[in-house]
Structures are given as structure tokens and as C-alpha cells.
């Protein structure tokens, strides 16, 4: 028996990464998981080294980031890798989630995998927001003020919760210090959730583009899919390096190179690009409390997909109507991102309201109706044949 199988610890690694049977038909969309693992490792390592030179005191936070950029050897590389790594992390995560939506990865027996994935998504958004505030530039200060103020919409106790989060009556030194502490902690929670995600996936194995069980047609992970993953890893690193070395500030906001000033309000307060769709949903609802509920509902609605999708065929590979509505949903999501960066004025508010309605309609109206229609067509075609 090979040593990797006889050793207790190596056998665990072997069963997950070497001999793990994978469907032979999986395509490059299944490589997003390995890229997300790479992104998480990059973020944790660069974050740890940056934390060695960062000061969470509100008077020193902005200056300490500049100190990392100017005085620490290769500090600029750490900072730009960490900042752009967050953007690439979300870009790959959105592609990973789109793959799950398109190929029905949320369907039984992988519902638990999907639920843990949604929790990872929420935790990653929290980590990104906390990290953005730690820079304490102008957009960081006002972003922290706006987002934490959302809790004031909670009846009776909202204002007390906001002051508890701030540690005072405004975003101040205690706010940045506790945000930094949480920002350091959350990635390790995400890493633990990733392990749980991986364990849940290991129970029934990966899905495949055909939407069938496919237990008889599988190949070992190592030798086939490890090298297939390496192709996308190298492509990812090339594109990532182009941003880090040649265009490091493209995905950021110029206002964040101005120290945070509570006395000067920016012309437009916007979060990072990867949070813009949900920011657009928040702004499309005039009522503050309903806007907050709608924004969080836009994330949690992902959890209802296993209940609303009643199709007898997993995934959209062979379903024309579902394909059409899926790509309309993707276009609508991108539109929400664009609207999130626009000023709150006509016609962007109205467009945001229509796009928000279509976003929720996809999960709660279109998916169940389309699955019913396609099931009917499937049974009619089966009977005729």
C-alpha cells in the first residue's frame, strides 16, 4: 500500500486532492474553486505581513498605510497585491456562483454545499467592508459611516446598536480598532468555512455539466484535474500581475488617497465595485428599513433556490428557456452594478427599482414557473417518443 494511503494524515489529503474521483465531463468553470483557494491564501498571507506594519489608531491608520507603501521593503507590492486580490477574489467568486446557478449545483444532494457557500459569500463581503474601512481614506470613513448607519433602521434599538458599533457618537478611534480586529479574524473563519464547504462537497462529489449522477464515469483528481487547474492558475496569475504591476489603482477609488475627514462629504459615496449591485438595491428603496431588508434579502434569496427550482433536469445545459432567463439575470446583475456607481437621481433610481424587481423575480417567480413549463415540455416529449 502506498504511504500516502497508509498514513492517517496523508490519507485524508489523498482522499480529497489526489485520488478523489471527479466527473470526467467537468469543464473549466469547475476550476474556479481552486482559484478561490489561491485567492484566499494570497489574502491571508499578504494581510498578515501588512498587519505587522499597520497601526489601527485612527490618527495613524492612513499614515501607516503610506508607511507600508513608501518605507517598508516591497510594501507597495504587499498593499497592491492585497487590494487587487480582494477584487479578483470577488470576480472569481461571482463566476463560481454563476457556474453554480447555471449548472444547478444548489440542487439535492449538494444543498448543504450551496448553503455553506452562501455563508462564505456573506463572510467575504463583511471582511472586504472591514478591510476597506481600515485604510481610513475619505471613502473609507464615509463608507463606514453610511453602512453602519443602516443598523439605525432597526426599530427601538437601532441607534443604540450604531453607537455600540462606533464605540462613540461617530466613526472614531474605537471603530477603526475594532474593525481591524474583526478584519484580521474573519479570513480565518472563512478558511474554516471553506474546509466545511470542501467536506460537504466530498460526500457526494462534484456535479457536472450534463446534470447527471455520473458515478460510473469518473477520473482521479491528480494527474488529470490538478494539471487542468494549473492552466487557469497560470492565466489568473498573469492577469493578476498585470493589474498589480501596471495598473494597481484601476479597481480602487481615488478619493481613498485623501485622509478621512468627517467635515468634508465626498460628491458621491460608493463602495468597492464588487459591492455595487447590492448598494444599488439598497438605494432603490426609498424607505430606510425596507431598503436594508431588501439588500440583505438579495443575498439570502440565494438560499431559496433549492426550494423554487422544481425542474426534473439539473442545470441549464439542455434547457433553452432557462438559459435565456439566466443570461438576462446576469445582464440585470451587471446593470445593478453600474447603477450602484451612479448618482441618486433620475433616471438611475427608477432603473434601479426595475432591476431590483427583476433580480428578485428571477429567484421567486421566473425559476419556479420556467421549471414547471420545462417539466411539462419534457413529459410531453417523453410521451411522444
From Swiss-Prot:
**Has UniProt tagged this entry with the keyword Transferase?**
no
Which InterPro entries does the entry mention? Answer: Cyt_b/b6_C (IPR005798), Cyt_b/b6_C_sf (IPR036150), Cyt_b/b6_N (IPR005797), Cytb/b6-like_sf (IPR027387), Cytochrome_b (IPR030689), Cytochrome_b_C_euk/bac (IPR048260), Cytochrome_b_N_euk/bac (IPR048259), Di-haem_cyt_TM (IPR016174)
* Compartments where located: Mitochondrion inner membrane
Q: SUPFAM superfamilies, per this entry?
A: a domain/subunit of cytochrome bc1 complex (Ubiquinol-cytochrome c reductase), Transmembrane di-heme cytochromes
Record Pfam families: Cytochrom_B_C, Cytochrome_B
Q: Which keywords does this Swiss-Prot/TrEMBL entry list?
A: Electron transport, Heme, Iron, Membrane, Metal-binding, Mitochondrion, Mitochondrion inner membrane, Respiratory chain, Transmembrane, Transmembrane helix, Transport, Ubiquinone
Where, by residue number, does the polypeptide cross the bilayer?
A: 32-52, 76-98, 113-133, 179-199, 225-245, 289-309, 321-341, 348-368
- Supply the CDD domains for this chain: cytochrome_b_C, Cytochrome_b_N
Q: Which domain of life is it from?
A: Eukaryota
Quote the cofactor binding remark: Binds 2 heme b groups non-covalently.
- One example GO MF annotation: metal ion binding
PANTHER family for this protein: CYTOCHROME B
Family recorded in the similarity comment = Belongs to the cytochrome b family.
What name appears for this protein in its UniProt entry? Answer: Cytochrome b
The gene it comes from is: COB
Amino acid at each position: 500500500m502506498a504511504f500516502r494511503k497508509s498514513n492517517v494524515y496523508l490519507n485524508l489529503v489523498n482522499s480529497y486532492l489526489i485520488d478523489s474521483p471527479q466527473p470526467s465531463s467537468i469543464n473549466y468553470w469547475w476550476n474556479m474553486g481552486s482559484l478561490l483557494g489561491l485567492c484566499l491564501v494570497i489574502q491571508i498571507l499578504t494581510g498578515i505581513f501588512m498587519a505587522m506594519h499597520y497601526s489601527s489608531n485612527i490618527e495613524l491608520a492612513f499614515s501607516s498605510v503610506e508607511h507600508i507603501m513608501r518605507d517598508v521593503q516591497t510594501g507597495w507590492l504587499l498593499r497592491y497585491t492585497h487590494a487587487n486580490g480582494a477584487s479578483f477574489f470577488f470576480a472569481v467568486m461571482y463566476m463560481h456562483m454563476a457556474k453554480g446557478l447555471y449548472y444547478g449545483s444548489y440542487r439535492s444532494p449538494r444543498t448543504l454545499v450551496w448553503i455553506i457557500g452562501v455563508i462564505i459569500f456573506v463572510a467575504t463581503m463583511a471582511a472586504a467592508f472591514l478591510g476597506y474601512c481600515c485604510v481610513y481614506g475619505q471613502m473609507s470613513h464615509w463608507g463606514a459611516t453610511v453602512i453602519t448607519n443602516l443598523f439605525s433602521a432597526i426599530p427601538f434599538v437601532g441607534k443604540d446598536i450604531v453607537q455600540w458599533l462606533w464605540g462613540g457618537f461617530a466613526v472614531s478611534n474605537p471603530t477603526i480598532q475594532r474593525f481591524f480586529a474583526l478584519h484580521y479574524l474573519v479570513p480565518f473563519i472563512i478558511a474554516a468555512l471553506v474546509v466545511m464547504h470542501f467536506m460537504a462537497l466530498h460526500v457526494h462529489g462534484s456535479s457536472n455539466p450534463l446534470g447527471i449522477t455520473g458515478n460510473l464515469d469518473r477520473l482521479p483528481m491528480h494527474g488529470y484535474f490538478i494539471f487542468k487547474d494549473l492552466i487557469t492558475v497560470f492565466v489568473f496569475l498573469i492577469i493578476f500581475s498585470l493589474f498589480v504591476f501596471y495598473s494597481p489603482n484601476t479597481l480602487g477609488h481615488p478619493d481613498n488617497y485623501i485622509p478621512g475627514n468627517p467635515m468634508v462629504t465626498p460628491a458621491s459615496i460608493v463602495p468597492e465595485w464588487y459591492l455595487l449591485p447590492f448598494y444599488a438595491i439598497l438605494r432603490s428603496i426609498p424607505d430606510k428599513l425596507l431598503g436594508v431588508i431588501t439588500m440583505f434579502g438579495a443575498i439570502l434569496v440565494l438560499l431559496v433556490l433549492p426550494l423554487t427550482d422544481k425542474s426534473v433536469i439539473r442545470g441549464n445545459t439542455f434547457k433553452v428557456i432557462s438559459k435565456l432567463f439566466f443570461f438576462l439575470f446576469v445582464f440585470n446583475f451587471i446593470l445593478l452594478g453600474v447603477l450602484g456607481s451612479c448618482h441618486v437621481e433620475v433616471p438611475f433610481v427608477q432603473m434601479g427599482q426595475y432591476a431590483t424587481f427583476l433580480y428578485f423575480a428571477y429567484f421567486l417567480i421566473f425559476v419556479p414557473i420556467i421549471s414547471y413549463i420545462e417539466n411539462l415540455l419534457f413529459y410531453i416529449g417523453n410521451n411522444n417518443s
